Amino acid sequence: MNSTNSTNSTTTATSTNTSTQQVVTSLVSNGTIFGVFVIAFLILRIKLKRIYEPKSSFNLINEEKKPEPLPQGVWQWLKPLLKKSDNFVIQQAGLDGYFFLRYLFIIAIYCAVSMSYIFPILLSINASNGNHESGLNQLAYQNVKHRGRYFAHVFCGWIFFWGFLYIIYRELYFYTSMKQAVLASPRYAKKLSSRTVLFQTVPKQYLSEEEFSKLFDGVKRVWIARGSGSIEAMVKARDNMAIQLEGAETKYLKAALKKIKKLNKKSPQLSVSDNIAEYVPDKKRPHHKINKVAKFFFGKKVDTISYIKEELPKLNQKVKALQEDHENSSPFNSVFVEFESQYQAQVAAQITTYHAPLFMTPVYIGIEPSDVVWFNLRMFWWERLGREVSAVSAIVALVILWAFPVAFVGMISNITSLTNEVKWLKFIYKLPKQLLGLLTSLAPTVALAVLMSFLPKFIRGMAITQGAPSKQNVEYFTQQAYFAFQVIQVFLVTTLSSAATSTVTEIVKEPTKAMDLLASNLPKASNFFMSYVILQGLSISSGALLQIVPLILFYVLGAFLDGTVRKKWNRFCGLSSMQWGTAFPVYTNLAVITFSYSIISPLILLFAAVAFFLLYIAYLYNLTYVYQESPDARGIYYPRALFQTIVGIYIGQICLLGLFAVGKGWGPIVLQVIGICVTVLIHLHLSAAFDHLSKVIPVDTMKPLDGVSDTPSFKNIYKGIESTKVKKNTFGANIDMDGIKELPEFPIKKYHKRSESVTEQQVENSIFSENTFEYQFNPANEANADGHAINAENLIEDVPLLADGDTMKIPPAPWWKRFLKPHIYYSYKAVKSRLPEIYGLVDPDERVNDFDISHAYDYPAVSAQCPELWIPRDPFGFSKLLISDVSGVVEMNDENATIDENLKFTLRDVPPPYNDVKDEANGEANGEFDTASKENNPFADPKYKEEESRSAV
């Protein structure tokens, strides 16, 4: 018996030492990576502006969005970056980026604040007079011996979990106010997408412009797409074939120049012929295999240029035939409808339109023409249901199958416990401590990150399969599915497999106590997740700053990958962007892990606070100075992320309940059940209060205070009607206009940016003292002919809205009162002050030409032209010969780009008109170059030449 106890104590000591070594090794290894990456970033940032400050250094975005450069010093940039105001971040990152950064910052601050009361209480209780654990386990729940101490964990859990539920309430209030203010601003309200609604599963009766216009007031245009089901695939095949020809022609040209260079070395006075074929024999011309099924082994090899010259006209003719006949094709059962204003569009999107179920639904608003997934606009309701079931089933099946490799990773993280049963694994103890720590900490966390990196592409494919009509909806579906993957695989499966591994010996001996043993060993898995949080906070954040992949692609591999001038153009002018469907879930799951272990192993709060703050800095820098905006989803990912974080609260509370049950602490069990019930109640109320409100724009933020004026969101469609005595409402009833009295105007509070003349007292009394202050409306301010106030800063007419109608002054208050009263200090009027000035102006990229607007939502495939190809101009005139050779097949030119004798490309201006074809090799949408950038040629900038001298291209 004594020998058994001795063995168990030895095993426990070994396991404890290993778990501590696991965290220490992770901290050291990831800290080293962090240091190397940050030092490299600080050095390279000063020189490599295309990678680290492209938005402020080159004309790649609209001038109005171009940020001021950060200071050039090694560390001098950090303080100005952290002091950037909300309106600056919104202007640079958009709503989606702003709320992503806000999420990271809030988690970091909440973890840091929570340490102030959890550490003094729980760490001292866990560490003193307990189960004689050592190392980090001494500071965790498993070291608690006396049941009476469970009450401390209960009450700390109440404060921590319910406190964050209050934070979620504040953030949801802020989100709805901010979104309403943004969408009601002139910049968004005047967008075509804001007043255009997509109706799907439209009955045949309404698949005509005339009939559909009868359903709503204020209909301006109706787009009903028609086209063959095969035309989109055929257009893509044609465009890819044209791009293949462009690559082959460039390769052919480079082969000739390479040969001439070689001949010049032998004979410097060589006279160059104008016949390119003299320098490139037939066998050296570009070739490819055409058998799609087995082209690598049995495909027939053909001359690429000759083959495409023959096949492209045939394919182009088929495309043109389908385009000319598209009017005879069956219409899509999805309809885009433009309304006179955003108000009419919102009304149409929110009312019940059709008497039968499953028709005229789903309904979407705010989809840009460039973001439409046209493939999914022709589905019937039964097809959509079938696809949804298939997509969800495929994801569930993958979750189950993915559990096996993830469980194996969890077992590795606790492999020292597994050696108790699997004797032959005991050789691991002979490894050096540092190597053992790497094996049990860094290797599993890296393996887990690599495993999860394969999933996003599959999930996005399932999003398209189930019928997502836009890029934003693809990301929204991905956010939900990928979060489920993250929680189940990264957290739950890893936790259970790690706990099961550490108790396998005891479970084999006493199977009836399996649940008790798992519950008691569950806290030990926290050490693995501390390592995972450290990995994310140190290695991932510094890697995001250094941008290793873009750095290597641009300066090293670009010479090999950018075989055409178009690819080089895309490399230089194409800015990276975030994919929110996968970005949010990774860090939401990190918050779930932190919250789940916050009471069981409080030390994780320290690592999480540091990790989230470092991630906040990294992404703040990238989103404001490096990345361009992703397809605008208007912030829809943020409320979902907040509600998903509640999963961590539930898991944390349920785990505590299980641990109390194992320890037979009946009083804490009752209190914990009460805590869970309160959490459920709050969750339900938050969902009921904000679920609908977060998806719509309220009427009072769109309609004018006087009831008749036009606003950016509202157009009075009855204005100007001759008979003003009697009008008809939407339902045809008569309205006596004499009986309607116009409301009197009264003072409206405004919010302006802080100026240098602001006194310290005004700043102290401000609602958001960091960047704004409040003052009463001054009737002496400028006014237009109608008496409406003019905002002198942005010269946009500011018509008072119904939501501005509260005359009550928002009282100055200290920070704690502002924290406790979000209904006042996060109200619509208060939040309006955070909007950038450009939100008072119309987007310069917005369509204003009536012709462009009338064709905005036309099915692109029915009018898509064959892309115009682009090759560089060479010193010997070969490019002109190549252009004439394909003149009857496809348009091609050699303007704005040259190639020298050393095969180096030089870009001089924008490429020829191009049809936004997806370049498979580069993964970027070609031809997407901003109008402002075309006017301000980035290649005429001396900074471009500096970057070229550093580039390997």
UniProtKB/Swiss-Prot annotation:
Membrane topology type: Multi-pass membrane protein
The protein's name: Uncharacterized protein RSN1
Annotated compartments: Membrane
GO cellular-component term (any): plasma membrane
Residue ranges with Basic and acidic residues bias: 942-953
Transmembrane segments: 23-43, 103-123, 148-168, 392-412, 435-455, 481-501, 540-560, 575-595, 599-619, 642-662, 666-686
UniProt family annotation: Belongs to the CSC1 (TC 1.A.17) family.
Organism (species): Saccharomyces cerevisiae (strain ATCC 204508 / S288c) (Baker's yeast)
Tree of life domain: Eukaryota
Entry's Gene Ontology molecular function annotations: calcium-activated cation channel activity
Principal location class: membrane
InterPro entries: Csc1-like (IPR045122), CSC1/OSCA1-like_7TM (IPR003864), CSC1/OSCA1-like_cyt (IPR027815), Csc1/OSCA1-like_N (IPR032880), PHM7_ext (IPR022257)
Region (Disordered): 910-953
Residues with PTM Phosphoserine: S949
Function recorded in the entry: Acts as an osmosensitive calcium-permeable cation channel.
Statement: the UniProt record of this protein carries the keyword Transmembrane: yes
Keyword annotations: Calcium, Ion channel, Ion transport, Membrane, Phosphoprotein, Transmembrane, Transmembrane helix, Transport
